[in-house]
């Protein structure tokens, strides 16, 4: 979880009741401050202190409700897995930043799809069928509770316009009540603002959430200025650091564009190629295809990975082309759980990242990676939704040209071997991504019978017709089509903003290399170990003064900078990270200030940093402090 809780995905811009105080009239709260205050207000409705933990699903559900959310069971299960023992306030802020409050317009739009007469009402029979058969199915008892609401039901119909108004009013009142409770409790007020006294004429504090994996927040004891200026930071005396180390690196403009990758003479070399894709999940995690590579004999190899160019409509944005890519090559050893890192594609020539070297015969794992500095959740709202289907004069349904163009792009992405056809194996990766299910042999046989195929593989036209059939099955309702598009990384304008397709090329001098897609899963676990190993092999290491077991490693790859924290002690430690003095930089956390918890005898990736604008000089300046 690395998204900014102060982003547009926050609780909204409702001004807290504290804005009536003299201090806040003079110094209006920023959007991030409003978000943080709303988070605290909701949390402190359930707990006495934000240092307490959420220890059950029920507590999480209640806290989200008090924050103006209406979480489904699916949403709760996403954040409270079988492995979850507790969630802290930091986790709660991150969840709220990702779970946007439902707007009235969104509610109305959803209900309108069931409003066959376009009169603002839905028959109880239709509503009951929809609520018990679709999505997260409701019980009959739950449906009856909705139908029996006196103010919004009459004559066998459900008035969804009144319901939406009631829903929004209730949600706003819930949040307002929590804020009033926070305002009324001066003790909680002092806890929120640390040592900063109410009514101070100098400036308003900006409590800044600092989320990250394995974080224990201590925001109750520390606040920061809204501009992130350390000279104005309001640090309470309860926040103490035992020791600190700092790193400063100045990178010249275009330094990361210089060609450090030299392509060998590939005239007589043999090549294998495969495509793949990074997909950004709702929680900020990245999922991608992963591969096995077989080398028949010892040979010099040239491996590259780069974003995949798709045939685009003129004028359409291609944000994924600027996403950084890398490929880590691992080999199994005596301990299958600990494969050996052989190399990774750290050299660059424009958008291509590559590696040249010799490898022995054998089977290798190829794990793609992206830092997360460029591939981020889209925050800019889409003003106009693209049309996916339309009916002609005869009433026959067809796909719009814009949607057909997008489906053609998706076809290129899922055609992993690049032969212009979709095999059952390739189609299953697509199905797993969009529906979570596989297509068995019998279903594939039916698919081949009904849609255009060649050599038992689906053609581009067959892929189009498959989605047209889906639209017809839903009588033109594009809901399922949008689920597919969102799963593949497209927004409502049919722009690919939350995925990055890529292509891998493997050249071998002495044999024919082979590559096979074996998984599509989260880029974590083995990848994090590989990244840590690559940094440890060549980093600038600094030991925390007086704490020789705590080491910060920073590695400059020209294109990006990676830092990891090594904890050799027998106790967990909390490290506070401050990037505020960095210039023209963006990191994968999305925040300048955050804290991480490092488990005993472990090493973890702290952050990746890249230039915001590659045409300008960028300065990496970071202070790592051990929290007392």
UniProtKB/Swiss-Prot annotation:
Query: What GO terms fall under cellular component here?
Result: ciliary membrane; cytoplasmic side of plasma membrane; plasma membrane protein complex
* SUPFAM superfamilies per UniProt: EF-hand (SSF47473)
The UniProt keywords, alphabetically, are: Calcium, Cell membrane, Cell projection, Membrane, Metal-binding, Phosphoprotein, Repeat
User: How does the protein's chain sit in the membrane according to the entry?
Assistant: Peripheral membrane protein
GO BP annotations listed? positive regulation of protein import into nucleus; positive regulation of protein localization to ciliary membrane; positive regulation of transcription by RNA polymerase II; protein localization to motile cilium; regulation of smoothened signaling pathway
Asked whether the keyword Phosphoprotein is assigned, the reply is: yes
Stored Gene3D superfamilies: EF-hand (1.10.238.10)
Q: What does this protein do?
A: Component of the EvC complex that positively regulates ciliary Hedgehog (Hh) signaling. Required for the localization of the EVC2:EVC subcomplex at the base of primary cilia.
Name of the protein this chain belongs to: EF-hand calcium-binding domain-containing protein 7
The scientific name of the source species is Mus musculus
